[in-house]
Amino acid sequence: MRIKCYLLGGGTNGYLVWDEQSREAMFIDPGAYAQAIADDIRKENLTLSLIVLTHGHGDHIGGVPQLRAAFRDAKLAAGADEAPLLADVDRNLSRDICGEAVAPVPDLLLKDGDTLTLGALCFRVLDTPGHTPGGISLYTEAIDDGLFEDDEYTGTLFPGDTLFHGSIGRTDFPGGDFEALKNSVRAKYYTLPDDTVVLPGHMGGTTIGLEKTQNPFVRP
């Protein structure tokens, strides 16, 4: 597995993830700069099959229309419970964040336990509400061999804005729920192996083990 992180508008992290053998790829949370993302996908000779949204806020969806136009065969996937927020340009904050209304309609509505595949790679969908009502995360037992050359890590989690290095996502936006977020972290993240790499929607990476011992907002 290979992963390329993009620093997008508003300090959002977007991730291009692909299987090295098949060259099949997905992009997680294209918040902006869709043209630059598309150029990189073509430069790497990748086939973009999936665009995945961890949640529906404008800083994570702003580039969706342009990226879908550039790769018409790519399927847009989001949590099934996130569809109402995606459709509501006031609640998804796209006007405030993107300067225009963005309301993408997913092709695939994902639920807890669903799986997504890229070549030989398999990603498990985790329902992780709290930051938004229908937020999801992706977990895979694969790691990026180029970034992590030893055997220290055994999996990768993409939590969107639910969990950060030493922090958690905001719950004061429409549909946010602090108790639901804490439950998502404890039930879905803290049950993963401690050596799972966490690549969040903002700020730098961390591990599950580090957050379990040092995150002041959610203790196991």
Could you describe each region identified by the protein language model?
Residues P30, H55, A80, D161-T162, ...:
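Short secondary-structure boundary segments
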Residues R91-N92, C122-P220:
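Metallo-beta-lactamase
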Residues M1-E44, S137-F158:
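Conserved beta-strand hairpin/beta-sheet module of binuclear metal-dependent hydrolase folds
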Residues L16-S22, L85-L86, N92, T162-F164:
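Short, basic/glycine-rich phosphate-binding loops at helix/coil junctions
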Residues Y33-T117, L121, E141-F148, T213-F217:
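Active-site HxH/HxHxD metal-binding segment of metal-dependent hydrolases
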Residues M26, V52, L76, T156-F158, ...:
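Residue-level marker for buried hydrophobic side chains located in beta-strands
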Residues M26-I28, L50-V52, V125-D127:
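Short catalytic-loop micro-motif centered on adjacent basic/acidic residues
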